Structure formats: C-alpha cells, structure tokens
C-alpha cells in the first residue's frame, strides 16, 4: 500500500514540475504566447535587465526558489484577454531574432514595438524625446550649407542680371543717340535745309558721297560745313547724354542734364573787326565771364539801355562797349528769338553766344553758339536758333566800329598785348633761371663725387682761363 502512495506522489510531483517549468522553458507554443503577452504588459513596470549571451551551459549556482501554485496561477492569462489584447496592439518582431531563446531561462522576453525606446549603436536605450547631438549637428550643418549656397546663388543671379541690364542698356542707348543725331542731320543738313542753302560743302570730306556726321564717340557726333563768305568754315559738335552707360543714365535721373550742340564758326582775319561780345542766361553770366579770358580782360556786363527794346530779362549781355552790344542785338533778332514775346517759344533752348576777335586758342576770331537739343520729334523748336548762325556770320563780317570805339578798343588791345608780352617774358626768365639752377645743382653733385686731384686740376685750369681772359688783347698790324 505504501508503494502505491509513493508512485502517486512521485507522479503528482513530476506533473507539478512540468506545469511550473513550461512558462520559462518555452516548450509549449500556446503557453509561450501567454508568457510573451504577460511580459509585454509588465515591461513598463519592471526595469529591463541586462541581456547577456551565454557562452557555456553551466547552471546557475544560486537557483531561484520554486514559485508557488498561487503565483503560477496569477501569471496565467485567459484566452479572452489574449484576443482583446491582440486586437488593440500587434507586437512587432524582436530585434534580437538571431539569439536562441532557449539559452535564456527565467527571463521575460521584451518585444520591441514602435513605442519602445530606441536602441543606440553602443547598446544603450535612447530617449526618443532627446535629440541626438550628432544628428542635430549634421542637420544644422546641412542647413547652413544650403543657406550659403542660396546666398551665393543670389549674388551670382544678381551679377548676371546686372550684366544683362548693362548689355541691353548699351545697345538701346547707342541706338537712341544715333537716332537723335540723324534726326538733327535730316532736319538741318539734308537737301533744301539751312546749311545746305548757306554752305557749298557739307560733310567730313570733299567727296560727294562723304557722310554728313562724324562719330567720335558713342555720344559725340560732329558736322562740318565750309564754302561761305566771311568765314573759313563751321564745325558743329553734338555732345549727347551717355545713354549707353547704365550708371550715367541712373545718375542723370538724379541730376538731370541736357543734350547740347555747339557751333564754332572760324571767321576770316581781314573781315572781322574788334568785337568782344557774349550773351547767356543771367545765372551763368558771371561764371562765363570768369572762365573766358577775353571776356575777363576786355568786357563787362552791360545794363539794358533806356527807351529801347531789349532782350528778355532772363538774359545778360557781356560786351566790350555798349555800342557793340546795341549794334549786334538788332530788332530782327529780338522779334525772332530773344524778345519777350518770342523767347518762351523759340528761345527756351538757347544757352550762350560768344563772339570775339581775342579768343584764346589757335583761331582768335571766332563765334560760338551753344544750344540744347530737343528730342527727335521736336527739332522744329531750334529752327530759329540755328538760323541765327548764318545771320550773325553776315552781320559780324560786315560790321565796322566807329572811330571813337575803335580807338578805345585799340588802346585796350595794345595794353593787353603789352601785358601778354610781359607775362611771356617773365615765363621765359623763370624757365631760364630754373634751368640754370638745375645745371648748377648737377655740377655740384658731380664735383662732390670727384677726387681731390681732379678738383685741383680743374681749379688750376679755371685760374689759367681767368688770367688769360684778364690779359689785354694786342692787335698786330702790318704797315706798307
């Protein structure tokens, strides 16, 4: 009877050991799932133990005590709980699939999910809320590189756009200046125009097919005419805005300037009398008198005469005498351009007029007219101004001073000639003194480099020359 009880207790003990060991050894698949799920539910409350890979099959020297039946029952989870938990969350595969689970006994398997902490390269768990310093520094470096590239691209794009604007403005401005010059030539230098009627030869050469305009620069054009009495010829110079230069164009928007044309008439020496006369705007009268040497020396600002029709109040006259001013400002000129009634319409482009027989330069007897150019569509505004040129060529060529005015002008010119001679003589003396001083300095520097023997010989030679110079010369004569 005792033998039967022994077998019964032995079987009961073995059965109990199998039931208790199955959740830890992973032999039963269904119980493994239950254990995995239970460990997944409890992994937040229990700190994860260190995972070490076993290299031997040695048993643990300190085995854990066997759990009681109550503890085993508390670890079991029903099938309904498993189904409910599997519907709410699906666990992901473990990151250590290459490990053998049989080698880890008595340890809950921690399943890595999307919500589990990140594992870094050194095996430590990283907080997903804490940014990686290396990753953040690389991202910041990439952002800085992209910002620098954008800035460099912006500078390059701006430079390319500026170059394109320069090129476009160059061709457009060049075309505008050429169109303006051709419009002037078509209005005043073509067939049946003012210059064609008053001069026998037009253009830059004597050939029949010679061009009318000479282009010296992108904004400078010249026109030449000759073959008229009282003068050698006429040279017109158009100085236009630098429209081809983008910077000059922008500067002109801030400081406006005008297109100008200057006429230089070279008078014959024998036809032009003693005349120094100028006319300009009142604001520029004093400046013009200071800049022009002949006006500064011979002429002064003339006040308007009483009881006579005169130029508009916006003009000022600079003349050698009142007689010359009265003779050159005729009623025809006042009615056509410079009078109060005509100046607003026909004289708005007038800048200055200068007539002188003492003009500084190669040609002394000259007449200069300076006008502002309108645009190509309004060339009719300066028709009467251009007509003044042939009118004054004839007027000044025929003009003769009275005896009283001539004596006054001759005395002034004689005095000016003496002053000019003195200035020239003083300039020559200064140049000669400067040359002597330089020569003396060079000789002193050369003597400083000589030896004592050379200096002694030179002094002896100089004394002999002085003695020879002091001896009176005797002239030998032969008597017959």
Swiss-Prot record:
<keyword id="KW-0175">Coiled coil</keyword>
<feature type="transmembrane region" description="Helical">
    <location>
        <begin position="153"/>
        <end position="173"/>
    </location>
</feature>
<dbReference type="GO" id="GO:0016020">
    <property type="term" value="C:membrane"/>
</dbReference>
<keyword id="KW-1133">Transmembrane helix</keyword>
<feature type="compositionally biased region" description="Basic and acidic residues">
    <location>
        <begin position="407"/>
        <end position="465"/>
    </location>
</feature>
<keyword id="KW-0472">Membrane</keyword>
<feature type="signal peptide">
    <location>
        <begin position="1"/>
        <end position="21"/>
    </location>
</feature>
<dbReference type="InterPro" id="IPR012879">
    <property type="entry name" value="CCDC47"/>
</dbReference>
<dbReference type="GO" id="GO:0032469">
    <property type="term" value="P:endoplasmic reticulum calcium ion homeostasis"/>
</dbReference>
<dbReference type="Pfam" id="PF07946">
    <property type="entry name" value="CCDC47"/>
</dbReference>
<feature type="region of interest" description="Disordered">
    <location>
        <begin position="38"/>
        <end position="72"/>
    </location>
</feature>
<feature type="compositionally biased region" description="Basic residues">
    <location>
        <begin position="466"/>
        <end position="480"/>
    </location>
</feature>
<protein>
    <recommendedName>
        <fullName>Uncharacterized protein At5g49945</fullName>
    </recommendedName>
</protein>
<feature type="compositionally biased region" description="Polar residues">
    <location>
        <begin position="133"/>
        <end position="144"/>
    </location>
</feature>
<keyword id="KW-0732">Signal</keyword>
<feature type="coiled-coil region">
    <location>
        <begin position="411"/>
        <end position="467"/>
    </location>
</feature>
<feature type="region of interest" description="Disordered">
    <location>
        <begin position="116"/>
        <end position="147"/>
    </location>
</feature>
<feature type="region of interest" description="Disordered">
    <location>
        <begin position="404"/>
        <end position="480"/>
    </location>
</feature>
<dbReference type="GO" id="GO:0005783">
    <property type="term" value="C:endoplasmic reticulum"/>
</dbReference>
<dbReference type="GO" id="GO:0005509">
    <property type="term" value="F:calcium ion binding"/>
</dbReference>
<feature type="compositionally biased region" description="Low complexity">
    <location>
        <begin position="51"/>
        <end position="60"/>
    </location>
</feature>
<keyword id="KW-0812">Transmembrane</keyword>
């Amino acid at each position: 009877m005792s033998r039967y009880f022994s077998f019964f207790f032995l079987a009961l003990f073995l059965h109990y050991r199998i039931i208790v060991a199955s959740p830890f050894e992973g032999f039963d698949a269904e119980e493994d799932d239950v254990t995995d799920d239970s460990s997944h539910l409890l992994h937040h409350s229990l700190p994860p133990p260190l995972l070490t890979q076993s290299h031997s099959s040695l048993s643990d020297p300190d085995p854990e005590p066997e759990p009681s039946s109550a503890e085993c029952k508390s670890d079991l989870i029903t099938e309904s709980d498993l189904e409910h938990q599997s519907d709410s969350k699906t666990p992901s595969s473990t990151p250590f699939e290459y490990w053998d689970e049989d080698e880890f006994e008595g340890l809950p398997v921690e399943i890595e999910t999307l919500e589990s902490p990140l594992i870094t390269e050194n095996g430590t768990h990283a907080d997903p809320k804490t940014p990686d310093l290396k990753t953040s520094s690389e991202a910041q470096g990439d952002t800085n590189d992209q910002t620098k590239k954008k800035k460099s691209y912006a500078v390059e794009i701006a430079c390319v756009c500026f170059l394109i604007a320069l090129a476009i403005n160059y061709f457009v401005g060049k075309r505008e200046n050429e169109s303006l010059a051709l419009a002037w030539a078509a209005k005043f230098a073509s067939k049946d125009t003012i210059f064609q009627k008053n001069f026998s030869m037009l253009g830059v050469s004597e050939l029949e097919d010679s061009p009318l305009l000479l282009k010296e620069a992108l904004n400078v054009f010249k026109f030449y005419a000759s073959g008229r009495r009282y003068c050698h010829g006429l040279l017109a110079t158009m100085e236009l805005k630098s429209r081809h230069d983008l910077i000059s164009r922008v500067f002109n928007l801030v400081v406006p300037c005008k297109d100008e044309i200057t006429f230089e008439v070279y008078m014959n020496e024998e036809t032009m009398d003693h005349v120094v006369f100028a006319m300009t705007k009142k604001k520029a009268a004093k400046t013009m008198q200071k800049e022009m040497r002949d006006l500064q020396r011979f002429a002064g600002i003339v006040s308007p005469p009483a009881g006579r029709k005169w130029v508009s109040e916006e003009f000022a006259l600079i003349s050698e005498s009142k007689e010359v001013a009265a003779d050159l400002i005729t009623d025809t000129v006042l009615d056509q351009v410079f009078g109060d009634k005509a100046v607003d319409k026909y004289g708005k482009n007038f800048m200055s007029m200068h007539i002188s027989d003492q003009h500084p330069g190669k040609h002394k007897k000259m007449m200069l007219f300076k006008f502002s150019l309108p645009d190509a569509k309004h060339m009719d505004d300066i028709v009467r101004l251009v007509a003044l040129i042939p009118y004054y060529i004839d007027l000044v060529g025929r003009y003769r001073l009275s005896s009283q005015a001539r004596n006054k002008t001759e005395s002034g010119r004689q005095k000016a000639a003496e002053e000019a001679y003195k200035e020239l003589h003083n300039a020559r003396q200064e140049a000669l003194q400067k040359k002597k001083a330089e020569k003396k300095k060079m000789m002193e520097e050369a003597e400083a480099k000589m030896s004592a023997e050379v200096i002694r010989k030179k002094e002896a030679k100089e004394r002999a020359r002085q003695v020879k110079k002091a001896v009176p010369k005797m002239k030998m004569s032969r008597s017959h």
